[in-house]
C-alpha cells in the first residue's frame, strides 16, 4: 500500500514508502493570505536600517536632514527686500513666541527663508544703505522707462494697423470709382457709335462723320 510518511528531516524530505502498518501523515502547506504582518516587519527593518545609517553620519549632515524634514527644501520663490528683512527681525524681537511658519505665511515666503533671515547677523552700513537706495531708484527708473516704451510701441502698432486699414479702404473706393467711370465711358462711346452708324449696301454697319450744312443750287432756285 502506498502511504506518505513523515521522515526525521521534516516535510521537505517526504518519501513514499511501502509500509503495512504506519501512521498516515498528509503533507500540509500553509499560505498566509494576509500580508500586513510581512509589511510591518519590512517597515521595521527599513526604519532600523535608516536609524543605523543616520547614526554614522556627521553632526552637520544630521542637522541638514532634520532641517529639511522640518522646513522643507530650500527653494525660494520670492525675494524679500531689506526693509522686509528688518521688519521680520523687529517682529521676532517684539513677539518671540511667534513661529516661523506663521511669519512665512505673513510675508509669503518659505519657513526656511525666515529661519535664515533670523539667523543672519549681517547688518548693512551707511555706505551699503546708500548703494542699495541708489540701486533701488535706478531699478525703478528702468522699470518706468520699459513700461513707457512698451506703451508707446503698443500705440504705434495700433496706429499702423489703422493706417493700413484706411489705405485698403481708399484703394477699394478708388477701384469702385474707376469701374463706374469705365462703365459710363463705355456706354457713351457705344451710344455715339450707334448714332453715327449707317448700314451699307452689304448690310454691314459703317460709321460716318457729320458734315456741316451747305446750301445747294436747288435751295437757291425758287
UniProtKB/Swiss-Prot annotation:
Q: Where is the transit peptide?
A: 1-26
UniProt keyword Mitochondrion present:
yes
Please state the protein's primary subcellular location.
mitochondrion
| Renumbered residue ranges of the record's region Disordered | 120-158, 177-207
Superkingdom is Eukaryota
Could you tell me the keywords of this UniProt record? Mitochondrion, Transit peptide
Q: Listed GO cellular component terms?
A: mitochondrion; nucleus
Q: Where is the composition biased (Basic and acidic residues)?
A: 127-158, 177-187
Keyword check for Mitochondrion, yes or no: yes
State the signal peptide span.
none
Localization, UniProt = Mitochondrion
> What InterPro entries is this protein classified in?
NGRN/Rrg9
Protein role: Required for respiratory activity and maintenance and expression of the mitochondrial genome.
* Annotated family: Belongs to the RRG9 family.
This chain belongs to the protein called: Required for respiratory growth protein 9, mitochondrial
Organism of this sequence:
Scheffersomyces stipitis (strain ATCC 58785 / CBS 6054 / NBRC 10063 / NRRL Y-11545) (Yeast)
Q: Which gene encodes it?
A: RRG9
